[in-house]
Amino acid sequence: MSYWVELWESIFTPGVTPVLAKSAHVACGALVAVFLGLYIGTKSIHCLILFFLAICLWLSLTWFLVELAHARVNNDLQMSSQSANKNDDNSNNQNPSNNKEMSDKESDSATTTQTFSVPEELLRARTTANNS
């Protein structure tokens, strides 16, 4: 499939697709290069200011894409925990001999926590972003 067709279809796809993210980075890089070239050619302070604004735009775009990725991971974890809880509830409801266990689980549900395996790079990136 053509790059332009993929880009056009990614506009109508919910979320951020790799083609759209790559295109945004290429566009920001081109904008930074143009303003750098204009500054070198004209030595105008205005071009230098626009160059730094373009860099800030690129950094904010990158930050936004990372936050979207974190939100997607958190949403996936939440959905998997909800489906796991529904599966546990369904298995307990099918076995009537576990009524006491089910009531114990319901009473302790506020204090119990579940652990999930999250890739270490995501946790490290999230921790680094929060500490900054």
Swiss-Prot record:
Coiled coil: none annotated. Residues 80-100 have a biased composition (Low complexity). The keyword Transmembrane helix applies. GO terms for cellular component: endoplasmic reticulum; endoplasmic reticulum membrane. It is found in: Endoplasmic reticulum membrane. Keywords: Endoplasmic reticulum, Membrane, Transmembrane, Transmembrane helix. The chain crosses the membrane at residues 20-40, 48-68. The keyword Kinase does not apply. Residues 41-47 are lumenal. It is a multi-pass membrane protein. Residues 80-132 are annotated as: Disordered. Residues 1-19, 69-132 are cytoplasmic. GO terms for biological process: vacuolar proton-transporting V-type ATPase complex assembly. InterPro entries: Pkr1. Functions together with the other V-type ATPase assembly factors in the endoplasmic reticulum to efficiently assemble the V-type ATPase membrane sector V(0). Belongs to the PKR1 family. This is V-type ATPase assembly factor pkr1.
